[in-house]
Regions:
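Hydrophobic anchor residue at the start of the ABC signature
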Residues: 46
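Conserved ABC ATPase signature
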Residues: 32-36
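Helical segment within the ABC ATPase nucleotide-binding domain
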Residues: 72-86
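Short, glycine/charged-rich "phosphate-handling" switch motifs in NTP-dependent
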Residues: 105, 117
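ABC ATPase C-loop
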Residues: 49-50
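Catalytic Walker B motif of ABC-type/P-loop ATPase nucleotide-binding domains
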Residues: 57-61
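Conserved catalytic motifs of ABC-family nucleotide-binding domains
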Residues: 53
Length: 136
């Protein structure tokens, strides 16, 4: 007879897998979230979403308020999720360089409208992108 696994147990097992994968969280597992650094909290937020096993992640401003070392850590994790775990990631990011380095396809918006679209690498080289970010 088939017995459906309890969702709480399944979520717990998934959380354990995520903790095993990210040493920074594993080492702080028994501490409250309020004592985590900004980067560790951002990783915890991403990890909480991963427990649900989504095929698509919507990520809003992952670098906002973080020190540069944590910005790099967050983008390394997103890159790993995209490449190793084949997750589709839709990202909104005001840090143009980081966002476009990460993007397969990027969109530069001005007043809510698409001003320029293209491959992330191409947009990084496009001088119009810099002008738009500087308000030109």
């Amino acid at each position: 007879m088939y017995k459906r696994q309890d969702k709480t147990e399944e979520s717990y097992q998934e959380a354990e897998k995520i903790l095993d994968k990210y040493e920074r969280l594993r080492n702080r597992r028994n501490q409250p979230a309020k004592v985590l650094s900004g980067g560790e909290r951002r990783l915890l937020e991403i990890s909480r979403a991963l427990v649900m096993k989504p095929s698509v992640l919507l990520v809003d401003e992952p670098s906002i308020g973080l020190e540069p070392r944590y910005i790099s850590m967050v983008f390394e994790i997103l890159d790993d999720l995209q490449k190793a775990e084949k997750k589709t990631i839709i990202l909104v990011e005001q840090n143009a360089k980081k966002g476009l380095e990460f993007a397969d396809i990027g969109y530069v918006l001005v007043s809510g409208q698409t001003a320029i679209a293209g491959k992330g690498d191409d947009l990084l080289k496009n001088p119009d992108v810099g002008r738009l970010f500087l308000g030109g």
